[in-house]
């Protein structure tokens, strides 16, 4: 085994089952590409991304860990968000939430 290697059995392995999801339309109003990582608190992303930020509180992108979504200038796309697990207390990022529900 190689350090960090994962040995996964055959078959499908669904991720994030049973967790609440939400779909939002997002548009990059800026003049530069914006990339958002898998676990970034979506409500606190770059202000050039135009979407319903209140609806995104306590949520992250529903994509595989370690991956990201890139928004090109002027691009509009639909994303699926997923509730954070556990106590759902969010700290850091841009400091807008700091644990508030």
From Swiss-Prot:
Per the record, the pathway is: Nitrogen metabolism; urea degradation; CO(2) and NH(3) from urea (urease route): step 1/1
Where in or outside the cell it occurs: the entry states: Cytoplasm
Q: What is this protein called?
A: Urease subunit beta
E.C. number(s) listed in UniProt: 3.5.1.5
Q: Which PANTHER family match?
A: UREASE
Query: Subunit structure, per the record?
Result: Heterotrimer of UreA (gamma), UreB (beta) and UreC (alpha) subunits. Three heterotrimers associate to form the active enzyme.
Pfam families to which the protein is assigned, alphabetical: Urease_beta
Give the Gene Ontology MF terms in alphabetical order: urease activity
- Biological process per Gene Ontology, one example term: urea catabolic process
Q: What keywords is this UniProt entry annotated with? A: Cytoplasm, Hydrolase
Query: Mind naming one GO cellular-component term on file for this protein?
Result: urease complex
**InterPro entries recorded:** Urease_beta-like, Urease_betasu_sf, Urease_subunit
Catalytic activity from the UniProt record: urea + 2 H2O + H(+) = hydrogencarbonate + 2 NH4(+)
Q: Which family does it belong to?
A: Belongs to the urease beta subunit family.
